[in-house]
Structure formats: C-alpha cells, structure tokens
Amino acid sequence: MLQQDSNDDTEDVSLFDAEEETTNRPRKAKIRHPVASFFHLFFRVSAIIVCLLCELLSSSFITCMVTIILLLSCDFWAVKNVTGRLMVGLRWWNHIDEDGKSHWVFESRKESSQENKTVSEAESRIFWLGLIACSVLWVIFAFSALFSFTVKWLRRSRHIAQTGLKVLGSRDPPASAFQSAGITGVSRCPGHPSRKFHQVDINSFTRITDRALYWKPAPRLSSPPLRAAPGNCQQMAPARLFLSLRLWAWRGGGESPNSRGTGEPGPKFHLASGMH
C-alpha cells in the first residue's frame, strides 16, 4: 500500500511547482491568468495589425518585416513556455539522449477527478481561438498577396504560415518559429481534445521534412577507371604527364618516327628557342 501510494504521488505531481496550489480549485468559466491571456493575444494580434498598417506606419519594408518577426518570436516563446502550460496545461520540449538522438516530449497536466479541474473554460477558449484564428488569417494574407501579385508580402506570409513544417523537420528549432509551430506542438500533447485525429506516423513526416530541408544533390556517377599498365600515359595525371614529356624533350631522349628501328637518336628539343 505504501509503495502504491508513493507511485500515485509520483504520477500526480504537477508539471509546475507554482501551480500545485491550484489543483484543488474547481473548473470555472473565469480567467484565472489575465496576464498570460493578454499576452497570448497581444503578440499575434499586434503582428497582424503591423502587417495591415505597415505602409501607413513606415515606408521601410525591412522595418516592418523585423517588427513582425520579433512579435511572432515572442508569441512562440510565450505559447511554448507560459500560456500553453498555464491556460490549457500543455507543454512540449526537445532533448537529446546519450546516443545523440533528438526526442520530442509532449506532456499534459493530469487531473485527479472530474470535479477538480485545473483548466478554465474561458482561458481554454481564448487560447485555442487565438492560436487557430490568427494562423488562418496569415494563410488568407498569403492567398490575397498571391492573387494581387504582391510578391514581397506573399514572401512574408508564406514564411510565417509554413514555419511549422520547418520546425518539425529541423534538429535545432529556431526561436523564430511562429504560428503553426505552436499549433503543432500543443496539438501533439496527450491532453489535446483532438488528439485522436493525430495518429499519423509523425516520424515518417519528420523524415520527409528532413529530406526537403536538408536536401543534398546526389553524387555524380563517375566512369570506371581505365585499366592501363603501370607507367602508361592513360594512368598518369595530366600534370605529371606534361612534366614527363617536357623532361623527355629537354633530355632529347627517344627516337623520332623517321629513325625508329635504325638506332639513331631523334632530334633534340630545347626549352628556350635561343639555346643550341
């Protein structure tokens, strides 16, 4: 009994020490983390506003691009480390084992009973609505830029909307992983409501993205080496062959084609035309 109780205590340990005091609170439709909820929407909504009003706020495309990247980088960090664990009790990270292999770990906060819920319904709605709606808006921006032939804005929206694919395929996820990266990480946690729809072999998908991101051209097929006798000209390197011919000409060795078989040496060659 004591061993079983100790195992139960080990399994029920909260993900975060600061949240142990909230495990016995009932699940209510109120916002218990207003600061986390505010910043969960602030960074992503601010990035969308800057994208829409960029031409009015600044004439520099680089300034707008850097501002959006910084806002979405802060949003990714907040979703992964703060808002995900506080608002919905989900988190994920990556670690490398002793063999040098990279492993993704996805966890969710355990709930002791149906009466003692640690996730607020209001915060859960805010979290998922902000996470999905803003990503859909970036996809809409990408298609609108495509049909309006605005290439520079299309490039911006495309990089933001497709970052999740890069994160899954990369060994070391960059800090600039944005919108879809948060959806990908949170949706793979065990406590996600739509977890049953994510039964696809993610390892195969990761291998595909690895090949797409770290693609290298195939080596050229070289012809088989010529099987020539040792000392043959076909086996010698070009530079070595050239030096051998120059040395042979300088020494005046060999026989000329006209004197072949007569034993008479051929004409002598010199390196400089003025030497006799």
UniProtKB/Swiss-Prot annotation:
Protein name: Golgi apparatus membrane protein TVP23 homolog C
Keywords: Acetylation, Membrane, Transmembrane, Transmembrane helix
InterPro entries: TVP23-like
Cell location: Membrane
Species of provenance: Homo sapiens (Human)
PANTHER family given in the database record: GOLGI APPARATUS MEMBRANE PROTEIN TVP23 (PTHR13019), GOLGI APPARATUS MEMBRANE PROTEIN TVP23 HOMOLOG C (PTHR13019:SF23)
Membrane topology: Multi-pass membrane protein
Region (Disordered), start-end ranges: 1-21, 254-276
Similarity field: Belongs to the TVP23 family.
Gene Ontology cellular component annotations, sorted alphabetically: Golgi membrane
